[in-house]
Amino acid sequence: REGKPLDVTITVHNGRMAAFYRQRRYLVSRVSLNGHIDTRGVSDLHIKTGEFGGTMVGNGIEADCEIDFKEKSLPSIVSVTAKGVIPSSMGLGDDIHDKMTLTASGRGPLSHLICEGTVTMPELHVPALDFYDVKGDIHYDDGAMTFSDVKARVYGGIVTARGDYNVDSRVYNIYLHGEGLDSRIPTKEPRFYCLVTLDGEIHCDGNVKDLVAFGSFSSSGGFYSLIPFRGITGTFHNRYRALDFYDVTIDTDFGLIHTDAFHIIDGKLHLGKIELVDKESGEAMSITDARNQKGPGRVISQIREDIKERVS
């Protein structure tokens, strides 16, 4: 209208819409829109959509927006809910299709909205980790998102997380702390039980193939087969579908069981060389060699007898 003011009521049923801003693009189907546009006053719009794609892929968006055209900066008040968002479409992980819901509301100039909201997911499955009932807080400021107080159930325990994510570069960093994780679930080994505490980090430079996770862990007392232990310590590294553990030490009554590496690949446990280390002398011997001869401190047969005595 060549700069002329608008004062109209608008209604759209089952439409299609394309939106572009900076490096972001969105293609939206089944659009229903109604509201009032007044370029000399306050405009309000309500929009509800079906599936959308582009920079982010999901099942639907519902939004309310109020824009004040009386001021040059176009101060706005918005509330948005995006349902069924696929994490992989945002660069969050490789081939992750568990769906999340993002809800946010905020205000500010239309070109620089600052919003607060929540993220929720019924479940999230990533290589070697299964999260349930994910819920946390988000803060959005000009393409930068921060996550805080995110909680989820993982392997019978609780994991809390915080992090940051950039919509345009898709660079993100996530910091995790977990407590009470049941070792039997990820290893799929009922004979190996303890409750694990872990601290970890996940980093991505924008290319999901470069995603890396690492951290350290410790555990309460537990048992492997019939052998009890006081606790486990070690570090881990996760890339793609392989979860690697390094410098793992198991503290037992008869010595320290140590391995430089064992791996969980596609859900299967692969053990490396395991050594039995005497706490006093530091002498090490492989478990295989210790089976039929004196190992560090004791022979394996004596260990078994000790276990039987404790049980009886």
PLM segments and residue spans:
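Short acidic-hydrophobic surface loop/beta-edge motif
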Residues: 52-54, 150-152, 250
